[in-house]
Each structure stands twice: as structure tokens, then as C-alpha cells.
Regions:
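Short, contiguous alpha-helical
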Residues: 8, 12, 16-19, 29-76, ...
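A generic, residue-level signal for flexible/boundary positions that often mark functional hotspots
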Residues: 1, 19, 109-111
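Amphipathic alpha-helical packing segments from all-alpha helical-bundle domains
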Residues: 18-21, 94
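Long, well-ordered alpha-helical segments
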Residues: 22-26
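Acidic/histidine-rich alpha-helical segments that form the ligand environment
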Residues: 78-117, 123-140
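Active-site rim elements
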Residues: 1-8, 84-88
């Protein structure tokens, strides 16, 4: 189970970094926009990227757990999660959903099993898990970059 354990660790680290970053962001800067949301290339806030990272995890592992591939977009809007404590609760929910999936993996070979996804084409679990880790880390990186636009603070343990 070396691959499963390694992936589990990477997702736990991802979650820990998001929680640490959230703790470093002043509440009044959580949804601060680096520039107006006009044009083709919106610049999202630190909080929005933290949420998008967790939402990627929730959507994939919610799909694996219960075959519900709902996009968490509507319940991860800033209006729905207006404070850092609301966001932290959502991060914990997404992490619990992910951990539940990893608890079902009994061996590395489980990651080779295929699962039906919304597109209709079956995909190996390993592909979905790696794609999700990449997408979630991408949004987390963007959250860190946005944080750097308004803060010089050193993030603890990062």
C-alpha cells in the first residue's frame, strides 16, 4: 500500500497547508480581489482559491464514495462561507470525505480499478486521484500567490 499511503500523505499535507494559510489570512482579506472581476481573466481571491482546492477534493471523493459527482460550486460561494471559520469547517468536511475514500482502499491495486465518471467513460481511480491532487494543488498555489499580494508574512511550517 505504498502508493495509497503516499497519496494519502500528500492529500493530508495539502489539507494542512490550506488550514495554515487560512489561519494566516486576515478575515478582511479572505475575499479581497486583486483587481476587479471584469474581462476574460478574472483574478480570484485567496479564499476563493482555498475553496476551489477543497472543492476539487470534495467533488472527486464524493463521487468515489457515493457516485454523486455534484459540483460543490453553489455551496462554496463566498456568500455561503463568509468567514474563516465557515471556510475551515468546509475544509474539514472535504478532508473527511477524502479520508473516507482512502479508508476503502485495501491495496495499491485498488487504484487500478475503473469507476464511471459523469462523462460516461470509465477511468482508473489512480488517474482521478492524481488529477484531483494536481488541480487542488494548483488552486492552493494560486491562493498562496494571492496571499503574497497583500502580505509579507511568513507562513508557519510552509
Amino acid at each position: 500500500m505504498r502508493i495509497v499511503s503516499s497519496l494519502d500523505e500528500q492529500f493530508r499535507l495539502l489539507h494542512g497547508r490550506s488550514v495554515a494559510l487560512l489561519g494566516a489570512v486576515p478575515a478582511d482579506r479572505l475575499y479581497w480581489q486583486p483587481r476587479p472581476l471584469t474581462g476574460l481573466y478574472p483574478a480570484h481571491s485567496c479564499g476563493e482559491h482555498i475553496l476551489r482546492s477543497a472543492a476539487a477534493v470534495e467533488q472527486t471523493f464524493g463521487g468515489i464514495n457515493s457516485n454523486l459527482w455534484d459540483d460543490p460550486f453553489e455551496w462554496t460561494l463566498p456568500e455561503q462561507l463568509p468567514t474563516p471559520s465557515h471556510v475551515e469547517n468546509y475544509l474539514a468536511e472535504a478532508e473527511q470525505t477524502r479520508a473516507r475514500s482512502f479508508g476503502l482502499f485495501r491495496s495499491d491495486s485498488d487504484l487500478l480499478k475503473e469507476i464511471a465518471v459523469p462523462s460516461g467513460d470509465p477511468r482508473p481511480l489512480l488517474d482521478l486521484v492524481l488529477e484531483t491532487l494536481t488541480r487542488a494543488a494548483h488552486h492552493q498555489g494560486r491562493a498562496f500567490a494571492t496571499f503574497r499580494l497583500f502580505s509579507e508574512a511568513r507562513l508557519p511550517g510552509l
